Regions:
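A structural "hinge/loop" feature
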Residues: 1-2, 25-26, 52, 112-123
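N-terminal lobe/hinge region of extracytoplasmic solute-binding protein
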Residues: 1-33, 149
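Extracytoplasmic/secreted envelope proteins and their assembly/folding machinery
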Residues: 5-9, 22, 26, 56-63, ...
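Sec-exported extracytoplasmic/periplasmic mature domains
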Residues: 13, 17, 47, 64-71, ...
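Surface-exposed binding/hinge segments that line
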Residues: 41, 60, 76-131, 158-160
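Gly/Pro-rich hinge or "lid" segments in bacterial periplasmic/extracellular proteins
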Residues: 117-168
């Protein structure tokens, strides 16, 4: 799963060929002195594979979706390092212009940037996710066939279930 996800999707950070953590969708980030808050600045010109803009609002949507119990996400527990608001949602926010993304943590977390490179934290396209037939009953319905909207270096162009996937 994750090996294929990194072909089709990108995160705020990634690991380079030397295993070093480097910005991917993020251009830069700032962390407060106490290690409790991060602000990421997104790169300009980011696009989904369908040509629509990818920005910090997509990251916010995706992280809230990951933490939402209704999605049944296997890795939702990883979001417990992030503070929550009174309504139970994650204490994260994209700027109105979609250029920056802010995160507040419950405590300093030495591996937080590593989480930003983990596939569960990769942004997903809200319009595709919520526009998929069967979305209400199957939160993963949007990406069950070749051609799903993605953000990574490759696009899934062929999918023979339980047999093979083709990426170009």
């Amino acid at each position: 799963g994750a090996c294929l996800a990194i072909l089709a999707f990108s995160g705020l950070f990634m690991y380079d060929e030397n295993g070093q953590l480097v910005p991917d969708l993020a251009e830069s980030y700032e962390m407060t002195e106490d290690g409790l808050s991060y602000t990421f600045t997104m790169k300009d010109g980011l696009k989904w594979s369908d040509g629509t803009e990818l920005n910090a609002k997509d990251v916010e949507y995706s992280w809230q979706r990951l933490a939402n119990p209704d999605t049944g996400a296997d890795y939702a527990y990883l979001t417990t390092v992030i503070a929550t608001k009174d309504d139970g949602t994650l204490d994260i926010e994209a700027s109105e212009d979609g250029k920056t993304f802010s995160v507040n943590l419950v405590a300093p977390c030495a591996y937080f940037l590593d989480l930003c490179a983990f596939p569960a934290f990769y942004p997903v396209p809200q319009a595709s996710v919520e526009g998929a037939d069967g979305y209400a009953d199957n939160p993963g319905a949007w990406c069950t066939e070749a051609g799903f909207v993605s953000s990574g270096p490759m696009v899934c162009t062929g999918w023979k279930h339980n047999e093979s996937m083709t990426y170009e």
